[in-house]
Amino acid sequence: MKRLWDISPPISSQSPVFPGDTPYRQQWKWQLSPECPVNVSEITMSPHIGAHADAPLHYANGATAAGCLPLEPFLGPCRVIHALDCGPLILPEHLAHAADDMPERVLVRTAQHAAVHWWTDDFSAYAPQTIEWLASLGVRLIGIDTPSIDPATSKTLDSHHVILRRDIRVLENLVLDTVEPGDYELIALPLALVQADASPVRAVLRELG
């Protein structure tokens, strides 16, 4: 059996959330008892908690919702590239060493340990010119082990607007702590949330061959 790497953080009331966004909450609506045969809970959360796929609707009014996105970009060969010392922005030179025969999907590890239990504004993001460069190589999906491909303080979301213009899909909040650089199969399908600006994904990598 081919090896799998689960690159999704756990989702719970401890999950970090962008300041002002909706945290994870769960309450039990029904509970097992002599009168009730099942447990059923109600969950409220932002679709940007945990590993998730942003939809164009997140950064453009009237654009495509998460559940209406084609699934092909979220499934197939991908490359994991380490850029652990990149600083606040991932630049093309941080990835150029791994650019030969680039597959259509690229995930970048920027942190020694992904922040799965705490929020921090101090994370790495993609420089817009890096996304332009990746698009020129035929990349259709980018991913990162931080909450956003733009800096936390950005009000213009320049990198998000590049992926909108270039029709590139994006995965955020991945956990790549135990994944070595190299090529894998990515499986990270968004849910069919046909009105949503993003969707949780259960992102996994599978060895090739």
Curated annotation (Swiss-Prot):
Annotated protein name in UniProt: Kynurenine formamidase
Known EC number? 3.5.1.9
Enumerate the GO terms in the molecular function aspect. arylformamidase activity; formamidase activity; zinc ion binding
**InterPro entries reported in the protein's UniProt record:** KFase/CYL, KFase_sf, Kynurenine_formamidase_bac
Which residues does UniProt mark as catalytic? Answer: H58 (proton donor/acceptor)
Write out the residues that bind Zn(2+) 1.
Answer: H48, H52, D54, E172
Identify the taxonomic lineage of the organism of origin.
Bacteria, Pseudomonadati, Pseudomonadota, Betaproteobacteria, Burkholderiales
GO terms in the biological process aspect are: anthranilate metabolic process; L-tryptophan catabolic process to kynurenine
Give me the residues that bind Zn(2+) 2, please: D54, H160, E172
| Pathway the protein contributes to | Amino-acid degradation; L-tryptophan degradation via kynurenine pathway; L-kynurenine from L-tryptophan: step 2/2
UniProt entry tagged with the keyword Magnesium? no
Q: What class of enzyme is it?
A: hydrolase
Question: Assembly and interactions?
Answer: Homodimer.
Q: Identify the NCBIfam families for this entry.
A: trp_arylform
Q: Which cofactor does it need?
A: Zn(2+)
Name the job this protein performs. Catalyzes the hydrolysis of N-formyl-L-kynurenine to L-kynurenine, the second step in the kynurenine pathway of tryptophan degradation.
